[in-house]
Regions:
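Short gly/ser-rich loop at a beta-strand->alpha-helix junction or flexible surface loop bordering the NTP-binding
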Residues: 1, 11-202
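A generic fold-level signal
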Residues: 4, 141, 262-264
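Single conserved hydrophobic/aromatic residue that forms the stacking wall/gate
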Residues: 1-16, 341-352
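Short, function-defining helix-loop hinge/capping sites that tune catalysis or transport
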Residues: 115-118, 287, 320, 352
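Surface segments flanking catalytic/ligand-binding clefts of nucleic-acid enzymes
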Residues: 181, 185-343
Length: 352
């Protein structure tokens, strides 16, 4: 009995120590990806805690931050503070870190030190979906994070996140700054492949369903918003029409090149079945030269048989104007049963 008691106390003490590496996941990973966008996944030979695999790896890259997580006998409570301080230094507000989400392979590896919320993957975590951000600290990539997002995001929020992951821009939701243009990091096919490879993992089925409405290559947050208004389910305020393309290229035929300077145009959101194009024109389109180019664009696209509808920032800012614009899009696409907002009076009554 004394031996059993000693072993039990030893297990308690061991749980107070921190196993490495620490893997950030779920909402903490989402917060991390908002403020820092590493692109190279860490490739490991085996599962997270295969000590032989770790021992055979090359030394960590010199550029990786040394946080002190590898200190001998590091207590879990100390590790919580180290990780939180590091995330705050990157720009994550401390109030967002009342707990830090972490991931382990199996349930027997789970520990519950104060400050950490431990999640179980239920199998060896795919090493190609882990990114090393500091010595002893990893984060799941955005493909895995997208699937996990269903545990705290609503379905419309997860839909938006899918567009952002597959976009050609980055918007930091923790900052008031503008978005930045950047190369596309993932494709919808990448995310679908991850879901298919991990269908038994929690959240994969819902994520796969959301991805049916996600499209590649949005160039701005407002282009994403325009697409979502069309593809989102009717119960979520959209038109429920997912068969669209983003940035559909239209080459100007030789016989129409005398009408415009540009050799081709791209339509923000295009519904090929009806030939309907939806454009978002932001404040930059108010420039005189830009307005002239827009006029040429609409002339050529109309001559080619496209049905074009333009949305503006003012319409997005005023609910009734946006409702009328969505009615026009529904009519052009041919969604006869989708005229959701029939009059200002009805909408005012609905809002009350």
């Amino acid at each position: 009995r004394d031996t059993d008691r000693s072993r039990g106390l030893g297990d308690v003490y061991k749980r107070q120590l921190m196993d490495l590496p620490i893997v950030l996941s779920h909402k903490t990973a989402w917060l991390y990806h908002n403020v820092a966008r590493p692109s190279e996944p860490l490739s490991r030979a085996s599962s997270l805690y295969d000590e032989d695999s770790l021992a055979n790896e090359a030394e960590p890259t010199a550029s990786l931050p040394k946080l002190g997580l590898d200190a001998k006998g590091l207590r879990a409570s100390t590790a919580v503070g180290i990780v939180a301080d590091y995330l705050v230094s990157l720009g994550i507000p401390r109030e967002e870190l009342d707990h830090i989400d972490t991931l382990v392979n199996f349930d027997f590896e789970r520990s519950t030190p104060a400050g950490f919320r431990c999640h179980v993957f239920g199998a060896p975590v795919p090493p190609g979906h882990l990114i090393e951000v500091a010595e002893g600290l990893l984060v799941v990539d955005e493909a895995m994070c997208f699937v996990q997002a269903g545990s705290w995001m609503s379905e419309p929020e997860q839909l938006e996140y899918g567009y952002e992951i597959c976009a050609r821009y980055h918007l930091n939701h923790l900052s008031t700054g503008d978005y930045i243009e950047m190369g596309q990091r993932y494709t919808v096919a990448d995310l679908i492949a991850y879901c298919n490879e991990n269908r038994s993992r929690q959240g994969a089925i819902r994520a796969a369903a959301v991805l049916k409405r996600v499209h590649d290559g949005a160039r701005s947050p407002m282009e994403t918003a325009t697409a979502i208004m069309v593809v989102a389910k009717r119960s979520q305020g959209g038109l429920g029409y997912a068969k669209v393309e983003l940035n559909h290229r239209v080459d100007v035929p030789n016989e129409f090149k005398y009408l415009a300077k540009a050799g081709y145009f791209e339509i923000d959101v295009y519904a090929p079945a009806s030939g309907t194009g939806v454009e978002y024109n932001g404040s930059d389109h108010l420039d005189k030269q830009r307005s002239a180019s827009d006029a040429e664009r609409m002339t050529v696209l109309s001559a080619l048989g496209f049905r074009m509808i333009v949305l503006t920032g003012t319409q997005f800012a005023h609910q009734l104007q946006l409702h009328r614009a969505m009615n026009a899009i529904a009519l052009a696409i041919g969604l006869k049963c989708c005229l959701l907002y029939t009059s200002d009076a009805a909408d005012e009554a609905r809002s009350v």
